[in-house]
Amino acid sequence: QTIVVDDITKPVPVMASLPTITRECAVTATDIPVPTATDNCVGVITATTTDALTYSEQGSYTINWMYNDGNGNLTTQQQTIIVDDIKKPVPVVASLPTITKECGVTATDVPVPTATDNCLGIITATTTDALVYTQQGTYTINWTYNDGNGNTTTQQQTIVVDDVTKPVPVVASLPTITRECAVSATDIPVPTATDNCVGVITA
């Protein structure tokens, strides 16, 4: 009498279709429940894979799971992993303050703003605009926060250079010049004043 034990039945995944796992910053092994299958001989089989279970770069990936009953029967399943950051950086200061100086604005007068990002944490703004302004007027700095994952936030900041301080005469009250016959230009010293921006001004 011949007795044959021949398992020809493949494992059957518990879940017919594995769910897509999506995260914004990264996917770690703890985010991926290891799937299982039922087998007519072994019972419950835990899947194995040679693919990575940690993904930190933005993109779409595929994990190839395998259920092996040890009797020559294999079943495979694929699972999609997506790392997709869709959140823009959030400026720490919702509205940047206007910076006003009388004579000029230098880079040290302009604190570089920051934003918080769900993946990177703190992001420092960048700009292609000037940070030094010496001429009277109103200017706009365009700041950009870039998280490196395709998400950017912009902010504008106003810079004002406006001299509102009048020159101050060096001599508060100019002396009367008296001559008996005539007064010439050499008898009249040209008065001066000090200015907060220019320095010494000749009248």
Where are these regions (language model features)?
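Proline-threonine-serine-rich low-complexity tracts
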Residues: 1-203
